[in-house]
Amino acid sequence: MSAPRVSFVSLGCPKALVDSERIITGLRSEGYEISRKHDGADLVIVNTCGFLDSARDESLEAIGLALNENGKVIVTGCLGAEPDVIRERHPNVLAITGPQAYESVMNAVHEVAPPAHDPFVDLVPPQGVKLTPRHYAYLKISEGCSNRCSFCIIPALRGDLVSRPINEVLREAEKLVQAGVKEILVISQDTSAYGLDIKYQEAMWQDRTVRTKFLDLSRELGEMGVWVRMHYVYPYPHVDEVIPLMAEGKILPYLDIPFQHASPAVLKNMRRPAHQEKTSRRIQAWRETCPDLAVRSTFIVGYPGETEEDFQMLLDWLDEAKIERAGCFKYEAVKGAKANDLGLEQVPEEVKEARWHRFMAKQQQISTNLLKKKVGKRLPVIIDEANGTIGKGRTRYDAPEIDGSVHISSRRPLRVGDIVTVKIEASDAYDLHGTAV
């Protein structure tokens, strides 16, 4: 009996990508083959995103495409929390499950295409199946979020914070390193809250006691000899404790912190920490401890009630903080979000668009000036793409897909996953250019 074949579509954020990796690992362990095409597969699984309207539309379109090309479709992920929305558009899907419903997905697969077990074939590597390139991997440390930001529905979709035991997380990280991963990207909905839900429970790791806590996790990962990058860090005071580890080179001098805005009025409406001056002082203090620190953040413009004065405050804050990387989103109403019930005046779409362009122009200017300062330096760069002696990679200050790149020329052939020293010879708004030495 030939092995059943499953085609897979993974949409959304890195957290959803890790969910997809877990499902695919389960499928491979039961003997299923993963098909690159819908046509010819026994069924298709679509892992959806349901956070923004644009993401919902993309998910519904992907489901429709899978139905057209295959006909047997199982839907999971965040949009799966709203089965009526999916059934209304696509009544012929076989099964719908919400996020993190791994067993339900596997049960649905078993009903459509029962597994063909082959106990003599080892189909799954020890670290599980990864959908990222071999040299980096996402490490998800928790599920859900206990914050109640008014623009967000993640707690409704994924529940409150549930931290994974620290010894389990460290075992997974160790397997990744043993498999050749050179960079671990720590992700969750709220990385700095890690362990709060279980009162920083202690566990044994390599004959010593460690706490399920952001600091302990950072310290232990920092001993594994690979790049460790922290994402989705909420700006709690105890983040300060991790900065010395960055200064010591234990983990990368990189913090991904979604500040969202700088106006106290807007932040209050968002139900976010509303102390932009305090935030600026903390960034300054972090840089005093770790001068090499790169800060990435995301912001929302056009939030209900945002005035021109509020927006100008955000631009002024960018000028003052001079963070290395910043993404910006135009506010989009999310079904079920508290922001819809605040009774605030909506910002016209053309004003949102104009503010977005002004924000991006400001940050581009800041980025250009900061990158110029790296010209002439020699920096370690991890290679993401290689074609003979030409390649593209990233410095310690840049995460994959969302940040800038280093365009490299070399006398010797470059290999994906290698970390090479590059002399930076030129820069532009977002990228660097240099020669491997």
From Swiss-Prot:
The keyword Transport does not apply. GO terms for biological process: tRNA modification. Its main location: cytoplasm. GO terms for molecular function: 4 iron, 4 sulfur cluster binding; aspartic acid methylthiotransferase activity; metal ion binding; protein methylthiotransferase activity. InterPro entries: Elp3/MiaA/NifB-like_rSAM, Methylthiotransferase, Methylthiotransferase_CS, Methylthiotransferase_N, Methylthiotransferase_N_sf, NA-bd_OB-fold, Ribosomal_uS12_MeSTrfase_RimO, rSAM. Residues 372-437 form the TRAM domain. [4Fe-4S] cluster 2 binds at C145, C149, C152. It is found in: Cytoplasm. Signal peptide: none annotated. GO terms for cellular component: cytosol. Residues 131-369 form the Radical SAM core domain. It comes from the Bacteria. [4Fe-4S] cluster 1 binds at C13, C49, C78. It holds the Pfam family Radical_SAM. SMART domains: Elp3. Its EC number is 2.8.4.4. Binds 2 [4Fe-4S] clusters. One cluster is coordinated with 3 cysteines and an exchangeable S-adenosyl-L-methionine. It catalyses: L-aspartate(89)-[ribosomal protein uS12]-hydrogen + (sulfur carrier)-SH + AH2 + 2 S-adenosyl-L-methionine = 3-methylsulfanyl-L-aspartate(89)-[ribosomal protein uS12]-hydrogen + (sulfur carrier)-H + 5'-deoxyadenosine + L-methionine + A + S-adenosyl-L-homocysteine + 2 H(+). Its cofactor is [4Fe-4S] cluster. Keywords: 4Fe-4S, Cytoplasm, Iron, Iron-sulfur, Metal-binding, S-adenosyl-L-methionine, Transferase. Residues 4-114 form the MTTase N-terminal domain. Catalyzes the methylthiolation of an aspartic acid residue of ribosomal protein uS12. Belongs to the methylthiotransferase family. RimO subfamily. NCBIfam families: 30S ribosomal protein S12 methylthiotransferase RimO (TIGR01125), MiaB/RimO family radical SAM methylthiotransferase (TIGR00089). This is Ribosomal protein uS12 methylthiotransferase RimO. It comes from Brucella canis (strain ATCC 23365 / NCTC 10854 / RM-666).
